[in-house]
């Protein structure tokens, strides 16, 4: 990762390599022994990142508030800039009972330089909380949604139903994780989310589970950037039925509404 970051890295926006830690999936708010085990894991992983020359550290996808606090504590000991993002489950509260916005407030108070949300939620169910977090905090805010159409009834992708006429149901009990394809947002939905966030002053933006180059490109365009992949953006003027290019025969255009 460091070698890739150093490729063509110059100017006022150099590439950065980030070290990463995330939810341990063993943290138990009622079992202090797991807290010590997780701290050891975080310390070891952060140490590896520092040894390899990380420019910054990211802690992400935490659904226990206290685990997020511990991750931030470990990262801050390095002196590197720290990003910390949470991923509350469908109950719309952290699993140890702390509110979503309150968790973010506490992370800011503890020194988080970028605080926000990532994963589990698509644009429709992440944006309302991102707006609240932006209003409540002064630090930089992060927003990295998944790429699926989550709803108020199903705010995360773990129990998202397929109501699109699926003829071959998933062998699992849920569409997660291997049958979410029909619920994916399109490029315009993702671009709209990113533009709304950027207009709110949120400048740490990305795409989480389900990300693809097209959606990353739309994110870049939403904040006014032109990137190498911009040349692949659709050019509908050349479409054989829906285009406006004078070379397109009229009888082909007429067929577009058939």
Where are the model-predicted features located?
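Domain-level signal for soluble alpha/beta catalytic cores
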Residues: 2-258
């Amino acid at each position: 990762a460091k070698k890739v970051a150093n490729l063509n890295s110059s100017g006022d926006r150099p590439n950065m390599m980030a070290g990463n830690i995330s939810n341990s999936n063993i943290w138990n708010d009622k079992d202090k022994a797991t807290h010590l085990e997780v701290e050891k894991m975080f310390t070891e992983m952060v140490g590896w990142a520092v040894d390899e020359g990380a420019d910054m550290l990211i802690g992400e996808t935490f659904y226990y508030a206290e685990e997020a606090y511990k991750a931030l504590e470990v990262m801050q000991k390095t002196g590197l800039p720290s990003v910390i993002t949470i991923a509350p489950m469908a109950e719309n509260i952290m699993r140890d009972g702390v509110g979503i916005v309150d968790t973010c407030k506490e992370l800011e108070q503890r020194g988080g330089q970028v605080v926000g949300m990532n994963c589990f939620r698509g644009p429709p169910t992440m944006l309302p909380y991102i707006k609240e977090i932006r209003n409540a905090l002064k630090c930089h805010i992060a927003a990295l949604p998944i790429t699926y159409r989550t709803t108020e009834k199903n705010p995360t992708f773990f129990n998202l139903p397929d109501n699109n006429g699926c003829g071959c149901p998933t062998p699992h009990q849920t569409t997660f994780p291997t049958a979410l394809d029909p619920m994916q947002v399109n490029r315009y939905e993702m671009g709209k989310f990113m533009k709304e966030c950027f207009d709110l002053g949120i400048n740490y933006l990305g795409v989480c589970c389900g990300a693809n180059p097209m959606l990353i490109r739309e994110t870049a365009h939403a904040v006014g950037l032109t990137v190498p992949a911009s040349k692949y953006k659709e050019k509908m003027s050349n479409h054989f039925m829906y285009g406006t290019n004078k070379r397109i025969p009229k009888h082909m255009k007429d067929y577009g509404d058939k």
